[in-house]
């Protein structure tokens, strides 16, 4: 029987099988509907994008409504409304929380006190997906990653889109199918797809992407990236979209 849960860990993996490799990640407060459970693993799907897989049962708790989400790259929940007090848990960008009350410049949650300036109400969004993506500049590359601790190409695109109120699948192949194709000259806010990879243009000459060459999120010239990917045998471009 299906049951609604949410993530109670800072970050958890969605795996292809029990004890399998990481396909994607979910963040604190993200909803996850459980279809079945066995051997300490729950099979189900993410509420933000429908992504299916296995999550450790220990990282799940019953679903509850949330009031705010984390808009900073990351933040901490403190035991008191004081930056010098003990921090209890790290909340990555995109985590969701339920604010109980406000105290000084903090919001009180069951996780502890979080700096209010790092939060936005649920239903309020950022306005520039490119600007969001550049927040992650220098973040380490991690296959299937969805946070500042480690992120991959499609995770970066999804984080930028969801933060701006746009729906976005989790993997690059699904993103390619989801976003309509465009043609014409390069401009800011275009998604460039290759087989198994995606990047986002930040201008008519540069793009940002999480890549395994640099093992981080980098900004590069569009022409240079097109040439290097083609030279590596992973070209050509298969699709372009505007977000």
Where are these predicted regions, by residue range?
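SH3-family beta-barrel domains
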Residues: 1-19, 25-28, 35-38, 45-48, ...
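Structural motif
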Residues: 30, 95, 189-190
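Short, compositionally biased
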Residues: 45-62, 107-121, 200-215
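Glycine- and small hydrophobic-enriched segments that form the cores of compact globular domains
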Residues: 94-95, 114-115, 127, 134
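Active-site nucleophilic cysteine motif
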Residues: 133, 147-164, 169
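Second-shell loop/turn segments in exported
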Residues: 140-147
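...with weaker cross-activation on analogous glycine-rich loops/strands in unrelated enzymes
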Residues: 166-223
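Hydrophilic extracytoplasmic domains
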Residues: 214-243
């Amino acid at each position: 029987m299906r049951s609604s849960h949410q993530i109670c860990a800072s970050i958890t993996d969605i795996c292809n099988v029990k004890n399998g490799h990481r396909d994607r990640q979910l963040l604190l407060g993200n909803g996850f509907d459980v279809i079945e459970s066995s051997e300490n693993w729950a099979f189900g799907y993410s509420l933000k994008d429908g992504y299916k897989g296995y999550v450790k049962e220990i990282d799940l708790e019953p679903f509850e409504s949330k009031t705010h989400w984390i808009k900073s790259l990351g933040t901490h929940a403190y035991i008191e409304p004081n930056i010098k007090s003990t921090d209890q848990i790290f909340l990555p960008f995109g985590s969701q929380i339920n604010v109980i009350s406000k105290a000084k410049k903090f919001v009180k949650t069951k996780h502890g006190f979080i700096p209010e300036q790092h939060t936005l109400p649920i239903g309020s969004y950022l306005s520039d997906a490119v600007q969001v993506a550049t927040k992650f500049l220098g973040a380490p590359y991690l296959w299937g990653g969805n946070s500042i601790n480690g992120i991959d190409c499609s995770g970066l695109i999804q984080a930028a889109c969801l933060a701006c109120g746009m729906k976005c699948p989790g993997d690059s192949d699904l993103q390619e199918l989801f976003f309509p194709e465009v043609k014409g000259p390069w401009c800011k806010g275009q998604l460039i797809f290759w087989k198994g990879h995606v990047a986002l243009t930040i201008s008519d000459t540069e793009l940002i992407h999480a890549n395994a060459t640099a093992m981080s999120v980098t900004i590069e010239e569009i022409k240079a990236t097109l040439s290097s990917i083609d030279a590596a045998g992973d070209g050509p471009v298969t699709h372009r979209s505007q977000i």
